[in-house]
Design a protein with these regions (language model features):
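Non-catalytic, surface beta->alpha helical segment in thiol-disulfide oxidoreductase systems
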Residues: 114, 120-149
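Hydrophobic beta-strand anchors of alpha/beta hydrolase catalytic cores
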Residues: 62-63, 93, 118
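Short active-site neighborhood of thiol/selenol oxidoreductases, capturing the structured segment around
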Residues: 56-68
Length: 149
């Protein structure tokens, strides 16, 4: 009888533990596969404003420091693509791969210590804000609106 009660108690604890895990997990954005995320990053890098061009004009700038191997960078790429489509005529969208030695001085200058790192510059190229990680689109939209005001 005692073994039966112990077995029931263990089963009940397991059910509650599993239910708690499933019900309390954060809802995530739709998954981006590694291949499609990398392809999107590559395409974005090819269509981004070159760093030298951005530093020579008077537009505000969003610099994304990324790495091809970074899965968070890959999952953020649809958000950055959508923002680029919406704001690209008024804001420079620059992408710098931290693994490319040519960007080492910019990585140091902007104190990048993780990816994705999004650095916002005003039209005089002063840093206004920096974000790291998977940033919600709504927050970035708000920041870009403020950057243009």
């Amino acid at each position: 009888m005692l073994n039966q009660k112990n077995g029931f108690a263990v089963a009940l604890v397991l059910v509650f533990a599993i239910a708690s895990f499933v019900l309390t997990r954060p809802q995530s954005a739709p998954a981006v596969s590694g291949v499609s995320g990398l392809m999107t990053l590559t395409t974005m890098a090819q269509t981004a404003t070159p760093y030298d061009v951005a530093m020579a004009n008077q537009k505000p700038t969003l610099i994304e420091f990324y790495a091809d191997w970074c899965t968070t960078c890959q999952s953020l790429s649809p958000t950055i693509t959508a923002l680029h489509e919406q704001w690209g005529d008024r804001i420079n969208f620059v992408m710098l791969n931290i693994d490319d030695p040519q960007w080492a001085s910019q990585v140091n200058q902007f104190q990048v210590n993780g990816v994705p790192n999004l650095t916002l510059l005003d039209n005089s190229h002063a840093v206004t804000d920096t974000f790291m990680g998977n940033i919600p689109k709504s927050l970035l939209e708000s920041e870009l609106t403020e950057l243009l005001s």
